[in-house]
């Protein structure tokens, strides 16, 4: 049996060798292919996981932007409300009406009745006046003129300042979130693949040993202080002349249809867009704007108005940090020059985004959306008083505003004042603010900033 087997092997030795070689090669090829498939599957899983992580972080960052905006809203609105004290003027007009009624009950209040009950109730819960200061002795006509201008100026100032704050925070937080994610991803790659980060660290890109990253990032976030304390006033001073131009000659007793009032607001907005955003009507319709020179000189001085309203001049940057941080922070920040360099890099990137024409267009879209939503609310409020059946904002677009009766400007001002107060409400459920935050163009801007991994 053994001799037979040995003979069989000798006779078929070549065939056995070829078969063994084929089997060995087949096994090796199969194993190699399986390994490659496994590596490919692992790489796909890692890429999908990375994409999910990026998406999750992106959505979390957008949520953080909105919550930060809501937390800063009272700080933004308080000085605007104080500087444009519509409620104080209303109180003075109410006092004048009471004095006239008490002085002569038989005289009809033909002029004083312009101050409607709607205007009185719209002030409930608003900022109270300073009772220690006696009211200025102004005529009733002067008070009405002042009330008219300040009510509309306050409304438009709130809309534009809130729009700018939303854009500013989305730029800030997406820049920081992208930077944090990129550094984390590269550090993980260095641990798993042995990438040397010494060169990057020496250049200040990854600063675990040379600086506390939180210092430059905290300093960067402090720059919203400029709009909250200085920039809003510049914006208000641009808006008020536009309101004077288009509403100054209208008597509060004059009756206007809703679409006429909306057209006046639209003219004001066009004037503001030209002065604040450097946008004409044609620019807005075409979706283009003036592009600033991206190579800014030392000090980041810009001819773009909103950039100057959002960021301080170079010489005021340390003053800003002093206003927003304690001495311990300032001492630690100044101890390392890398902190200043890192902050300057962040500010330069932010400045470049702000000088992009797309930013002005996005601010315009936010302001337009806010004004439209407020007008919708005014229409609903007026409809509810005239119709027994409730009307939702879902079918408001089906209503022909030309069918509306005219209203006294005073009544429309009362509604504007009421809606202005609602714009100061920093509740998560505030529908107008939520709509502003969900503007598609704003989300596109955030995505472009977050995904910009160019050095």
From Swiss-Prot:
Q: Where is the composition biased (Polar residues)?
A: 113-125
User: Is Transmembrane helix tagged as a keyword?
Assistant: yes
Phenotype on disruption: Leads to a peroxisomal-deficient phenotype and mislocalization in the cytosol of peroxisomal matrix proteins. Affects the assembly of the peroxisomal translocation complex and impairs the interaction between the peroxisomal docking complex and the peroxisomal translocation complex.
Gene Ontology biological-process annotations: protein import into peroxisome membrane
Which residue ranges run through the membrane? 155-171
Keyword Transmembrane helix carried by entry? yes
User: GO cellular-component terms in the record?
Assistant: peroxisomal membrane
Q: Where is this region: Disordered?
A: 113-135
**Swiss-Prot/TrEMBL induction comment:** Expression is induced in the presence of oleic acid or methanol.
What membrane topology is annotated for this entry? Answer: Single-pass membrane protein
Q: Which UniProt keywords apply?
A: Membrane, Peroxisome, Peroxisome biogenesis, Transmembrane, Transmembrane helix
Q: Which compartment or compartments is the protein found in?
A: Peroxisome membrane
Please give one Gene Ontology molecular function term for this protein: protein-macromolecule adaptor activity
Q: Which PANTHER family match?
A: PEROXISOMAL BIOGENESIS FACTOR 3
Q: Write out the function statement from the record.
A: Peroxisomal membrane protein required for peroxisome biosynthesis. Shared component of both the peroxisomal docking complex and the peroxisomal translocation complex. The two types of peroxisomal matrix targeting signals, PTS1 and PTS2, are first recognized in the cytosol by their receptors PEX5 and PEX7, respectively, which then carry the cargo to the peroxisomal membrane. The peroxisomal targeting signal (PTS) receptor-cargo complexes interact with peroxisomal membrane protein (PMP) components of the docking complex.
UniProt lists the family membership as follows: Belongs to the peroxin-3 family.
Oligomer and partners = Component of the peroxisomal docking complex, composed of at least PEX3, PEX13, PEX14 and PEX17. Component of the peroxisomal translocation complex, composed of at least PEX3, PEX2, PEX10 and PEX12. Interacts with PEX19. Interacts with the pexophagy receptor ATG30.
Put simply, this protein is called: Peroxisomal membrane protein PEX3
The source organism is Komagataella phaffii (strain GS115 / ATCC 20864)
């Amino acid at each position: 049996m053994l001799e037979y087997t040995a003979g069989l092997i000798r006779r078929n030795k070549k065939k056995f060798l070829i078969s063994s070689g084929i089997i060995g090669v087949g096994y090796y090829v199969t194993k190699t292919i399986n390994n490659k498939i496994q590596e490919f599957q692992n790489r796909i899983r890692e890429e999908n996981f990375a994409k999910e992580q990026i998406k999750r972080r992106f959505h979390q960052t957008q949520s953080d932007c909105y919550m930060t905006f809501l937390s800063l809203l009272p700080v933004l609105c308080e000085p605007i409300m104080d500087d444009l004290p519509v409620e104080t003027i209303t109180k003075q007009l109410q006092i004048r009406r009471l004095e006239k009624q008490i002085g002569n009950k038989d005289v009809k209040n033909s002029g004083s009745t312009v101050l409607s009950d709607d205007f009185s109730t719209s002030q409930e819960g608003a900022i109270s006046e300073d009772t220690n200061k006696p009211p200025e002795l102004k005529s009733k006509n002067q008070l009405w003129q002042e009330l008219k201008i300040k009510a509309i100026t306050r409304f438009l100032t709130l809309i534009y300042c809130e729009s700018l704050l939303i854009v500013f925070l989305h730029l800030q937080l997406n820049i920081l979130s992208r930077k944090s994610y990129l550094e984390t991803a590269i550090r993980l790659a260095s641990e798993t693949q042995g990438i040397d980060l010494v060169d990057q660290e020496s250049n200040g890109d990854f600063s675990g040993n040379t600086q506390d990253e939180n210092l430059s990032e905290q300093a960067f976030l402090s720059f919203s202080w400029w709009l909250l304390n200085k920039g809003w006033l510049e914006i208000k001073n641009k808006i008020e002349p536009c309101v004077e131009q288009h509403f100054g000659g209208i008597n509060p007793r004059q009756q206007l249809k809703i679409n006429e009032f909306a057209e006046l607001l639209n003219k004001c907005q066009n004037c503001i867009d030209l002065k604040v955003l450097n946008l004409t009507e044609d620019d807005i319709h075409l979706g283009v704007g003036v592009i600033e020179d991206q190579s800014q000189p030392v000090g980041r001085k810009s001819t773009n108005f909103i950039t100057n309203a959002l960021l301080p001049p170079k010489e005021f940057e340390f003053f800003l940090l002093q206003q927003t941080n304690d001495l311990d922070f300032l001492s630690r920040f100044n101890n390392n020059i890398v902190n200043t360099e890192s902050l300057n890099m962040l500010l330069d990137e932010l400045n470049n985004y702000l000088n992009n024409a797309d930013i002005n267009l996005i601010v315009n879209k936010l302001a337009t959306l806010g004004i439209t939503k407020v007008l919708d609310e005014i229409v609903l409020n007026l409809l509810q008083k005239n119709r027994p059946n409730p009307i939702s904002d879902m079918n408001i677009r089906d209503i022909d505003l030309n069918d509306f009766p005219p209203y006294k400007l005073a009544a429309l001002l009362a509604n504007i004042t009421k809606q202005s107060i609602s714009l100061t409400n920093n509740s998560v459920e505030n529908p107008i603010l939520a709509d502003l935050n969900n503007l598609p163009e704003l989300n596109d801007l955030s995505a472009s900033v977050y995904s910009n991994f160019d050095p």
